[in-house]
């Protein structure tokens, strides 16, 4: 079936219809008529706001104007394309740092020759040979996975020697944490969270109940066996199917003796290093993993990750002061996707969702699982912008929408009885029963992947970008129009 001939219908639990929209959305009169129920009414090109003129600078000045400590954070449920922007920005920064999460954060980047790299722990700045990469204290580190990434990079000509620093305060994620992840999911049965089963939650659980093992513990092999024994014994007492005995402990200790020797050149007091670097005026770029809608506090709990992938996680995950953090860039897809379970108000079910999924190649970097897909949710995006205080946005995968004759944006929520919902709710019962009001915009039905100037985009594509800016109140400075490293428009 041709994409252009199909009108994608969102989840039937949420309705499209003309309705009163609360004033807090800041909609001007020329757009109110476009909140429709399965309608083909389209706004005229003349109603598009000319936001572009306010943000037209060349790419170099745009990047160089970023603050000394800047960050790139996910603005949806992950998989927005953060790694590509970090890779591009890294050329202008001395240090790229990860502050939270673990190998559940899959970032796909491409080098100048178009070779693909899928990274999970190593910061995306590694492809820039002049950049130092820091894995901060807030990250949980699976050493076999880290070494595998390093070996893969080295095998492809990317030098890692002296370029990766691992915090001595970071917690170690063991293979048995991954096993526990699967056991917990099996226990939860139908109410499972949809974890990547990379052991992230169990490792953070060990950290919080204070029986976790940190990188610095590898320097003390006289006490390491006792700490590991206590941790394994705790797991065995919790799960009957987890088999643990002296032989397993002996094997793990010997294994980690080898790991400790290999990791030693990378181990650093990164809190001291980061603050010294700030004092020396080094430029630092923080690479967030996952996204704010998966934040342990602000996401759709309990369908969230176990760390803080929002602005606050930068300070706690690196040990730097809030006052030194400057520009934060939110990365958001031109539509929305989500892996695993949890509420998804603008989800498109059935064949329509499949078409968007295959057009955008929406399959998880870490798990390979197909992602759920839907229209852009402006209510959720505004919520995320408020929490993080973004100075700008990077709109990615705009090219994926090129085949659609019309594009929808979820602009407000209401309860079943029509009562407006003024903000993104924390109550999942309410969130799962919401109706979404959509605004319909015209598609551009042309290939935009080779365009490099904003002014050269089709008017309908510009209108879509500018409408998002108007709705969320944050400028879009970067627009992704393909997976390649150069497929980026600076606005």
Swiss-Prot record:
The active site is at 79 (proton acceptor), 107 (proton donor). Keywords: Chloroplast, GTP-binding, Ligase, Magnesium, Metal-binding, Nucleotide-binding, Plastid, Purine biosynthesis. It is an enzyme of class 6 (ligase). The keyword Plastid applies. One of its GO terms (molecular function) is adenylosuccinate synthase activity. Its main location: plastid. Its EC number is 6.3.4.4. Gene3D superfamilies: Adenylosuccinate Synthetase, subunit A, domain 1 (3.40.440.10), Adenylosuccinate Synthetase, subunit A, domain 2 (1.10.300.10), Adenylosuccinate Synthetase, subunit A, domain 3 (3.90.170.10). InterPro entries: Adenylosuccin_syn_GTP-bd, Adenylosuccin_syn_Lys_AS, Adenylosuccinate_synth_dom1, Adenylosuccinate_synth_dom2, Adenylosuccinate_synth_dom3, Adenylosuccinate_synthetase, P-loop_NTPase. Its cofactor is Mg(2+). GO terms for cellular component: chloroplast; cytoplasm. It holds the Pfam family Adenylsucc_synt. Substrate binds at residues 365-371. Mg(2+) binds at residues 79, 106. It catalyses: IMP + L-aspartate + GTP = N(6)-(1,2-dicarboxyethyl)-AMP + GDP + phosphate + 2 H(+). Pathway: Purine metabolism; AMP biosynthesis via de novo pathway; AMP from IMP: step 1/2. This protein may be expected to contain an N-terminal transit peptide but none has been predicted. Plays an important role in the de novo pathway and in the salvage pathway of purine nucleotide biosynthesis. Catalyzes the first committed step in the biosynthesis of AMP from IMP. Belongs to the adenylosuccinate synthetase family. PANTHER family: ADENYLOSUCCINATE SYNTHETASE (PTHR11846:SF0). This is Adenylosuccinate synthetase, chloroplastic. The gene is PURA.
């Amino acid at each position: 079936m041709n994409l252009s001939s199909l009108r994608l219908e969102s989840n039937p639990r949420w309705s499209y219809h003309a309705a009163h929209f609360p004033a807090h959305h800041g909609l001007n009169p020329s757009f109110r008529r476009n909140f429709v129920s399965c309608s083909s009414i389209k706004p005229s090109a003349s109603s598009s706001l000319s936001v572009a003129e306010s943000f037209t600078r060349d790419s170099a000045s745009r990047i160089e104007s970023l603050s000394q400590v800047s960050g790139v954070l996910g603005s949806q449920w992950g998989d927005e394309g953060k790694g590509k922007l970090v890779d591009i920005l890294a050329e202008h920064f001395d240090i790229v740092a990860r502050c939270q999460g673990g190998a559940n954060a899959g970032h796909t980047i491409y080098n100048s020759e178009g070779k693909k790299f899928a990274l999970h722990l190593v910061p995306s700045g590694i492809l820039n040979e002049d950049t130092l990469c820091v894995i901060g204290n807030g990250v949980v580190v699976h050493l076999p996975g880290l070494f595998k990434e390093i070996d893969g990079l080295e095998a492809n000509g990317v030098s890692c020697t002296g370029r990766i620093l691992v915090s001595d305060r970071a917690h170690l994620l063991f293979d048995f944490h991954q096993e526990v992840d699967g056991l917990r999911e099996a226990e939860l049965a139908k109410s499972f969270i949809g974890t990547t089963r990379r052991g992230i939650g169990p490792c953070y659980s060990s950290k919080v109940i204070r029986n976790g093992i940190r990188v610095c513990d590898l320097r003390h092999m006289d006490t390491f066996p006792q700490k590991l024994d206590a941790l394994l014994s705790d797991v065995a007492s919790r799960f009957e199917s987890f088999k643990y005995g002296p032989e397993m402990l002996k094997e793990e200790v010997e294994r980690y003796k080898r790991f400790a020797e290999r990791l030693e050149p990378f181990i650093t007091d990164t809190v001291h290093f980061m603050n010294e670097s700030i004092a020396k005026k080094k430029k630092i770029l923080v690479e967030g993993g996952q996204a704010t809608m998966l934040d342990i506090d602000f996401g759709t709990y309990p369908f969230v990750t176990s760390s803080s992938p929002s602005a606050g996680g930068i300070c706690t995950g690196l040990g730097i002061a809030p006052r030194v953090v400057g520009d934060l860039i939110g990365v958001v897809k031109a539509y929305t996707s989500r892996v695993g379970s949890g509420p998804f108000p603008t989800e498109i079910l059935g064949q329509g969702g499949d078409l968007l999924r295959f057009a955008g190649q929406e399959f998880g970097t870490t798990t390979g699982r197909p992602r759920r897909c839907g229209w852009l949710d402006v209510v959720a995006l505004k919520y995320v912008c408020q929490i993080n205080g973004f100075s700008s946005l990077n709109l990615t995968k705009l090219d994926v929408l090129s085949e659609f004759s019309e594009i929808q944006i979820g602009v407000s929520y209401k309860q079943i009885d029509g009562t407006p919902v003024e903000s993104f709710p924390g109550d999942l019962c309410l969130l799962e029963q919401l109706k979404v009001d959509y605004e319909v915009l015209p598609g551009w039905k042309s290939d935009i992947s080779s365009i490099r100037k904003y002014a050269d985009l089709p008017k309908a594509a510009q209108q879509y970008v500018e409408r998002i800016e108007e709705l969320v109140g944050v400028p879009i400075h970067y627009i992704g129009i393909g997976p390649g490293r150069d497929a980026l428009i600076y606005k």
